[in-house]
Amino acid sequence: MRKRTEPVALEHERCAAAGSSSSGSAAAALDADCRLKQNLRLTGPAAAEPRCAADAGMKRALGRRKGVWLRLRKILFCVLGLYIAIPFLIKLCPGIQAKLIFLNFVRVPYFIDLKKPQDQGLNHTCNYYLQPEEDVTIGVWHTVPAVWWKNAQGKDQMWYEDALASSHPIILYLHGNAGTRGGDHRVELYKVLSSLGYHVVTFDYRGWGDSVGTPSERGMTYDALHVFDWIKARSGDNPVYIWGHSLGTGVATNLVRRLCERETPPDALILESPFTNIREEAKSHPFSVIYRYFPGFDWFFLDPITSSGIKFANDENVKHISCPLLILHAEDDPVVPFQLGRKLYSIAAPARSFRDFKVQFVPFHSDLGYRHKYIYKSPELPRILREFLGKSEPEHQH
């Protein structure tokens, strides 16, 4: 019995040992699993938080980029819509184009009293008001030669009017668009011309400065004609020259053509920074650059100018002018391209109307920097005028 039971006992012991070892490994595995879960609980949220923050930051950045892009797209569509709408607006309302041509509503310099030219350093200048037509009043400045500045102090309008009959020649100055007769570069030119012994008479067209009326090419030309006749009625046999600048060259050639047709031409015509006609000038103007290649540019932008009665056809007018002609133009003119002034000269020079008169073109090199309105700064200007117009003899008393 003892021998038979020993193997059984040994077998039971081995099974118990095996059972205990298997239960131990299971317990160990269970314990490892618990530790792993505990570690995950401890480390999981801390590791997940940076990932969540990064995701949120990326979403915000993408949202901002999307918002910026949407705003840029809206701005782009608005600009594009405005770009397309402007030509149609101008076509439907030709008066807009007329205002852009005249720019009479741009009054610079601001806050000056045109009744007091002495405030602009013109202490030998008188302010007048003339009435070319009913309901139209224009402001006029008359600057006497600089050699008379002492005698001119405190004198009234009658003294200035009588002074036109002196032996000094007279320049009727027709200014361009925008501003007034008190514009800085205009005042500086009056001073130069006055120092050379000329009377200078200038005015603001109807609708400019303190002048009353509605601007138009016809009205501007009629205002100039009225002032010219007013001068001639007081100047006797003194030479009267007409000087036009920029848009004023269009008024000047309109005026001189009319004077030649009635056989009372001026003694000379001076055109500073002239163009050929208003259509070519508008097409060449810097403001037209963004629309120059727009489909139907002429129909949208140029035809409304013509339909408003604005032509300023210098190229046609010079064919009917019979008096000496001097053209001054700076090569670096950014407003009226130099080639338009040269083209006008090439039209005028061979014209039959000038066969008995001198036609001269004087360019000013771009290095001088005179651009559109600073030719008055040229030290050569007195010599140019003296050679073309003749010497103005100064008088020291009146």
Swiss-Prot record:
The chain crosses the membrane at residues 75-95. Keywords: Cataract, Deafness, Disease variant, Endoplasmic reticulum, Glycoprotein, Hydrolase, Lipid metabolism, Membrane, Neuropathy, Retinitis pigmentosa, Transmembrane, Transmembrane helix. It catalyses: 1-(9Z-octadecenoyl)-sn-glycero-3-phospho-L-serine + H2O = sn-glycero-3-phospho-L-serine + (9Z)-octadecenoate + H(+); 1-(9Z-octadecenoyl)-sn-glycero-3-phospho-(1'-sn-glycerol) + H2O = sn-glycero-3-phospho-(1'-sn-glycerol) + (9Z)-octadecenoate + H(+); 1-(9Z-octadecenoyl)-sn-glycero-3-phospho-(1D-myo-inositol) + H2O = sn-glycero-3-phospho-1D-myo-inositol + (9Z)-octadecenoate + H(+); 1-(9Z-octadecenoyl)-sn-glycero-3-phosphoethanolamine + H2O = sn-glycero-3-phosphoethanolamine + (9Z)-octadecenoate + H(+). It is found in: Endoplasmic reticulum membrane. GO terms for biological process: acylglycerol catabolic process; adult walking behavior; arachidonate metabolic process; glycerophospholipid catabolic process; monoacylglycerol catabolic process; phosphatidylserine catabolic process; phospholipid catabolic process; regulation of inflammatory response. Its main location: endoplasmic reticulum. Glycans are attached at N123. Selectively inhibited by DO264 (N-3-pyridyl-N'-(1-[3-chloro-4-{2-chloro-4-(trifluoromethoxy)phenoxy}pyridine-2-yl]piperidin-4-yl)thiourea). Reversibly inhibited by triterpenoids, but with rather low potency. Optimum pH is 7.2-9 with 2-arachidonoyglycerol as substrate. It is a single-pass membrane protein. The active site is at S246 (nucleophile), D333 (charge relay system), H372 (charge relay system). One of its GO terms (cellular component) is plasma membrane. Changing D333N: Loss of 2-arachidonoyglycerol hydrolase activity. Residues 96-398 are extracellular. It holds the Pfam family Abhydrolase_1. GO terms for molecular function: lysophospholipase activity; monoacylglycerol lipase activity; palmitoyl-(protein) hydrolase activity; phospholipase activity. Glycosylated; glycosylation is required for optimal activity. Belongs to the serine esterase family. This is Lysophosphatidylserine lipase ABHD12. It comes from Homo sapiens.
